[in-house]
């Protein structure tokens, strides 16, 4: 195999590290931040040269699809990573109309998701769930289901067909959607439609 420059070696090492840590490769932006390259086109250029030299293989039809080749081969199979749809914003404050169009996809390890075809992600807007560790801008991982147990965090549609993330309680003659923010009041409803249960949270620390 053709020898690599120091920058190319740094990029290859970072890709290997992230695959071993997370089960899927880093984004172009993450690679750039790790090796000190501000331009995504420069990162793409280095990836192309790594591919030409036989160190990696890319699939242009899939995001983050990088396969490490050579002696330290690390395969990322289609079974090991699931492209989970991000379906728009949902409020964690005042309810807003649910947006169901898929904005993009986010790779998650298949091992942490059961029934991957029934999982989606939503971006949180608001601060009503901060005491549960869910903050404005976070992505929540949601498993589609139409029922919930008391105390579970759900994505629910209100009587006005608006979506919100709250803790679910079924009480005597009503439903209570409880925020996890002591300064806010619960939402009391006669009827509520559960879209899914929140099973995880992703936060970008950069």
Swiss-Prot record:
Residues forming the catalytic site: 128 (for autocatalytic cleavage activity), 166 (for autocatalytic cleavage activity)
EC number from the UniProt entry:
3.4.21.88
Gene3D superfamilies reported for this sequence = Umud Fragment, subunit A, Winged helix-like DNA-binding domain superfamily/Winged helix DNA-binding domain
Q: Which GO terms describe its biological process?
A: DNA repair; DNA replication; negative regulation of DNA-templated transcription; proteolysis; SOS response
Protein keywords: Autocatalytic cleavage, DNA damage, DNA repair, DNA replication, DNA-binding, Hydrolase, Repressor, SOS response, Transcription, Transcription regulation
Indicate the residues that the entry says bind DNA: 28-48
User: Matching CDD domains, A to Z?
Assistant: HTH_ARSR (cd00090), S24_LexA-like (cd06529)
Q: What class of enzyme is it?
A: hydrolase
What's the catalysed reaction?
A: Hydrolysis of Ala-|-Gly bond in repressor LexA
| Keyword Thylakoid in annotation | no
InterPro entries recorded: ArsR-like_HTH (IPR011991), LexA (IPR006200), LexA-like (IPR039418), LexA/Signal_pep-like_sf (IPR036286), LexA_DNA-bd_dom (IPR006199), LexA_repressor (IPR050077), Peptidase_S24_LexA (IPR006197), Peptidase_S24_S26A/B/C (IPR015927)
Instruction: Provide the GO MF annotations for this entry.
Output: DNA binding; serine-type endopeptidase activity
UniProt site positions, description: Cleavage: 92-93
Q: Does the keyword Transferase apply?
A: no
Pfam families according to UniProt: LexA_DNA_bind, Peptidase_S24
Quaternary context: Homodimer.
Which HAMAP family does this entry report, sorted A to Z?
Answer: LexA
| Family label | Belongs to the peptidase S24 family.
Purpose: Represses a number of genes involved in the response to DNA damage (SOS response), including recA and lexA. In the presence of single-stranded DNA, RecA interacts with LexA causing an autocatalytic cleavage which disrupts the DNA-binding part of LexA, leading to derepression of the SOS regulon and eventually DNA repair.
The protein in question is named LexA repressor
